[in-house]
Design a protein with these regions (language model features):
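Jelly-roll (double-stranded beta-helix
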Residues: 1-204
Length: 204
């Protein structure tokens, strides 16, 4: 079992992700990590959550009144996000391209339209006013040794397109490295690699 209290260096394998139904029941999500232990997507009682999902058609997004969201398109050509902040307001439309972290509040009406086919996304949920989230895409050059100064209480490195070597061992594409604060060595192979780096911190 993943122990997120210990902040130890470990790899979460794709085979360990938990399949769950979207809150609105219109699709599925692969849950990578959730905190605290025992929290669930259905109850919405989590402080933070990491997940990935495939979106194959235009879809409304589930509402999460107590959470902020960051979405990153891992595969696919992009989406149009539409938000309505208040009933009766016109929608705000934003185009989101691949590997562009996109932040939006979870307590508003949101939907997406696919620009050119299905996408796979990565989502970070953080409890509003309680958890701060930093999300960035890091591209490693071929054979590069990258030292990640992971500053959050909880930190994760997701291998987007290729496997990399880490202080915890090999991190295959689609797997996630979990660690506490400190320096972590991430080494790309001869073809380079792209990583998604997530740091989460308790506020106040």
């Amino acid at each position: 079992m993943l122990d997120l209290e210990m902040n130890s260096l470990m790899i979460i394998r794709k085979s360990e992700y938990k399949r769950a139904t979207w809150k609105n029941g219109l699709g599925f999500t692969d849950e990578i990590a959730i905190y605290p232990e025992g929290a669930s997507l259905a109850k919405g009682d989590f402080q933070w959550r990491l997940s990935s999902a495939r979106i194959e058609s235009a879809s409304p997004f589930s509402m999460f009144p107590a959470h902020d969201r960051v979405l990153v398109i891992l595969r696919g050509n992009g989406i149009r996000m539409a938000h309505r902040y208040e009933e009766g307001d016109p929608e705000e439309i934003n185009e989101v391209g691949p590997l562009e972290p996109y932040e939006f509040p979870g307590d508003i009406q949101s939907r997406c339209e696919l620009m050119k086919g299905a996408i796979t996304d990565f989502s970070v949920f953080s409890e509003t006013g309680r958890i701060g989230a930093q999300v960035a895409v890091q591209e490693l050059s071929p054979d590069e040794d990258f030292i990640w100064n992971s500053e959050g209480r909880w930190n994760f490195a997701f291998a987007i397109d290729r496997s990399i070597d880490t202080d915890a061992g090999n991190l295959p594409e689609g797997d996630t490295l979990s660690c506490g604060p400190g320096e972590v060595r991430l080494t790309a192979g001869g073809h380079g690699a792209k990583l998604l780096l997530v740091s989460l911190e308790a506020l106040g």
